[in-house]
Amino acid sequence: LQPVPVWGLKAVSIGMLVDEKQAMIWRGPMVMGAINQFLTDVDWGPLDVLVVDMPPGTGDAQLSLMQKVPLAGAVIVSTPQDIALIDARRGVTMFEKMKVPVLGLIENMSYFCCPNCGHNTELFGHGGARKEAEALHVPFLGEVPLLAAIRASGDDGTPIVASAPESEAAQAFTHGSYTPLTLP
């Protein structure tokens, strides 16, 4: 399988292989098979870093990946609600038990910025991931706001930092509270 070059990255996804109208009803063995196929059958070529976007939770997908590949680290992404932070906490605990360094926690949908008046509204709460990171003694890596421009650029297939580098949305990624990662 050949990865698709996208903005200087090599990408592959189950979504690229299955019709968008087809339901993905997979049990653990099918998920594990897909992960194994992506790791062994995709012609990645030389890589500095392999980023794997995983579904939330602590199930078969995460365990399969940890068994197949020596991971340099994991970044946990969570929204600020208490219920989401429970999953984030479980994820941190799972990676630590499996001896995978947790590189940090990111808060997604940290706040909504009204495109008309610029007022920030904390729809899902705010700061929960930062507090959780502190409690778990892992680095807090930053916040991603809920902005229409980020969604629109994603739908267009162009990163917001490329399509509108000076925008508030782009600056959330480039000038925000982000902490650069150093891999172990």
Map each language-model feature to its residues.
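C-terminal lobe/tail of nucleotide-utilizing enzymes
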Residues: V92-P180
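Inter-motif core of Ras-like GTPase G domains
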Residues: Q62-D82
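Glycine-rich phosphate-binding loops of nucleotide-dependent enzymes
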Residues: V12, I35, M54, Q67, ...
